[in-house]
Amino acid sequence: MNSRLCIMALLLCFSQALLGHFTVIEEIEKLKKYFNSSSSDVGDQKDIVSDILRNWQNDRDVKVIESQIVSFYLKLFEALKEHKTIQESINTIRADLIVNFFNNSREKMDDFIKLTTIPVNDLQVQRKAVNELVGVMHRLSSNIRRKKKGSRCCFGGGDRLNQNYPARSI
């Protein structure tokens, strides 16, 4: 009986996840219809975001470009806030971004937006940013080194004595 409940709960979770995904897709379709994005003049041009994303293959690199893409869409949604007829769609998509990109943390999203709206032409901001730069660079470089160390696997080489026969040891 206990396993049946677990299976039912698992199915419920999957159905909720799929339902949420379809809801976002429906809202995106509403935006496409609102902007008439299937028009021939839209298809004649190169993609704005998809082509760029295809160029970034490395996992570490993908996170960098994904953050820029999310920033782009958040700015786009902010610019569209006056369009009342599509606000529900925008809010649904924004909520999905919070769940998927910001690990369901509104605070992380607020920090992200705060960082993207800092006025870089302000002299005081420039002075503070330059003052913090050494610490920021140190933290970023140590994060990259940590990721490189963590990405080593027992199947990918590393410090094993016998790399040709992973199951054997000398």
From Swiss-Prot:
The gene is IFNG. This is Interferon gamma. It is found in: Secreted. Homodimer. Interacts with IFNGR1 (via extracellular domain); this interaction promotes IFNGR1 dimerization. Disulfide bonds: none annotated. Glycans are attached at N36, N103. The keyword Glycoprotein applies. GO terms for biological process: adaptive immune response; defense response to virus; humoral immune response. InterPro entries: 4_helix_cytokine-like_core, Interferon_gamma. It comes from the Eukaryota. It holds the Pfam family IFN-gamma. Residues 1-20 form the signal peptide. Its main location: secreted. Released primarily from activated T lymphocytes. Type II interferon produced by immune cells such as T-cells and NK cells that plays crucial roles in antimicrobial, antiviral, and antitumor responses by activating effector immune cells and enhancing antigen presentation. Primarily signals through the JAK-STAT pathway after interaction with its receptor IFNGR1 to affect gene regulation. Upon IFNG binding, IFNGR1 intracellular domain opens out to allow association of downstream signaling components JAK2, JAK1 and STAT1, leading to STAT1 activation, nuclear translocation and transcription of IFNG-regulated genes. Belongs to the type II (or gamma) interferon family. GO terms for cellular component: extracellular space. Keywords: Antiviral defense, Cytokine, Glycoprotein, Growth regulation, Secreted, Signal. It comes from Sigmodon hispidus (Hispid cotton rat). The keyword Metal-binding does not apply. GO terms for molecular function: cytokine activity; type II interferon receptor binding.
